[in-house]
Amino acid sequence: MGIEENLRLMQTLDNAWNAKDWETFMKRHSENVAVYWPGQPDPTRGRHAHHKESVEFFKAFDNHLDNNPYKILFGYGDYTCSVARWTGKNIGSFMGPDGRIIPATNKKFELEFCTVAQWKNNEIVEEKLFYDLVGLLKQLGVTLTTKTQAEKVPAV
């Protein structure tokens, strides 16, 4: 498959995301896709797991990618890279990067969202998602907590 076809498929994937067209969304990801999200220690593995987490994501965030046109869109070999304006509102609870459940803030956000995808046979086999997680949390009014443990200092 060529670069132009991969770019076209990327556009249809983001169109599907915006429309919650889960059938097309699933077709764009391979059965064993690995998806890397900001703040997530391990990738999501598998088409069905990524579909499930995406449906849950929409329960927490009413969101939209401005992908017509993208801010940046290009391909190289089997890869595509897109940067889009990403807007939305936090409408439901979600798990923060510190592991706690954060209740809905009902606040809006606007960020840039970048996807780097590797394609094989018209499907994404690896997808890396990039956005400013700290900026998102700040716009939502969320403060992260840290779990600290008293340091044991040896007696002198």
Protein language model annotation of sequence segments:
Residues 1-156:
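C-terminal and inter-domain tail/linker signature
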